Amino acid sequence: MKKGLLTGLLLFGFFFGAGNLIFPPTLGYQSADQLWPAVIGFIVSGVGLAIGTLLIGTVINGGFKKELDEKIHPIFSLAYLIALYLAIGPFFAIPRTATVSYNIGVAPFLPDSKSGLIIYAAIYFAVAFYLAYNRSSLLSSIGKILTPIFAGLILFLVVVGAFKFGQTSPELAGKTDLTAAKAFGNGFIEGYNTLDALAAVAFSVVAVNTLKEFHFSSKKEFEKTIMSVGVVTAIGFSVLYIGLAFLGNHFNVASALAKDADLNVGSYVLTMASRELFGTFGQAFLAVMVIITCLTTTVGLIVSVGEFFEETFPRFSYKVYATVFTLIGFGVATLGLQTIIAFSLPVLMILYPITVVIAFFVLVNKKVAFSKRGMQLTVALTTIISTVSSLASALKLEGLAKALEILPLQGLSLGWMGPAIIGILIALILPDKIKGEAFDFEAFQTK
């Protein structure tokens, strides 16, 4: 029981960040009277893919890189992991933590000014850099204590908010054409924004090293603990997401305000709901907790990404990479939260489908033999379709977008699934089959 609880807190700590707070309320507001299909879509991608990928990573002999080298190609493996670490690092996740903490924790107390964000980001990244440069464990230790407390407080906010605002009807203006299927697709894509499935690939190495410290007595105990913790963590996040989405769905956001391109609805809902329910003190308390949680996440990401690049390209030291990535994160953060989200989504719509296919092959190939060429074809098809689809959407290429509608589920931004399934079937038919190694529990315990 103790191992399960500790492991659950470990997994929760890996994923919980301010980004997990702002997207469910935004989705709730946008989904109008189609809240449940939207939330289910969000949970499938934001919870299911993330926790599934991390759990798969804990039962791989050698990690995702070794699997990609063997099943696909070392060059693809390197390119994919570099793109992934840059996404969860200096380009998207790191600057987003700064902007989210500013939007929720600082901006409500300041006059509207661009300089406020720049000054805050400079101080924020100076502190983060100092802690990451010296690889301080202090903030990590604080984060392990504060993260579950903060999550509990957010859940309390959600429960109180449900009673306070639950009778308010969802905003339907301009959303009458939203179907259940479209809402599910919107929720599924919105779940990409959490970045958790991508982070799971990176954090699986840390998870394995931490799990080794528990000294499981048998493989059965290890597997039972992992599965039960996965279920419990999934339920916990799902309850949190449902509550936050419900709050966003029923909290009154003026239509004119919601149209402001610089406003993040999720941040606004959390901030204003805290103020209405608990007054200025409650809002200030939320602000402090968000800033500390975000700072913890930022330091952890700078360290993880810096260590990956130091190991991959040892010509430069960790401290050089930490410096460079902190500066990049600061520069991107000054663009503002909405701009970061807008630029990140097209990239995530490419990386997420690839990650799903990779996780599928890594898991299933332990039991079912697949052709190596077939697996390469599947990843190639997924990469091409998701890239073309993302570009068509981002660049508003109507002709290309129309042509892609021939693909099943393309209307839900899941057009890559059809070609991926065809690739998987081909991988089952072609002769050059290989089978992944079974999880070596003894080696896991002794390494």
Q: Model features per residue range: what roles?
A:
Residues 134-145, 184, 207-236, 254-261, ...:
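Hydrophobic, small-residue-rich membrane helices and short re-entrant helix-turn-helix hairpins
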Residues 183, 375-447:
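A generic transmembrane alpha-helix motif of multi-pass inner-membrane proteins
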Residues 8-16, 86, 160-166, 177-244, ...:
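Hydrophobic, membrane-embedded alpha-helices of multi-pass small-molecule transporters
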Residues 48, 52, 149-161, 226-253, ...:
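Selective recognition of specific alpha-helical transmembrane segments in multi-pass small-molecule
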Residues 90, 94, 151-179, 197-198, ...:
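Hydrophobic alpha-helical segments and their helix-loop junctions in multi-pass secondary transporters
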Residues 133-161, 344-356, 375-385:
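Membrane-interface loop-to-helix entry segments
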Residues 64-69, 240-295, 346:
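TM-loop-TM module centered on a large, flexible mid-protein loop between adjacent transmembrane helices
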Residues 59-67, 125-146, 213-216, 330-343, ...:
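Membrane-water interface regions at transmembrane-helix termini and the short interhelical loops
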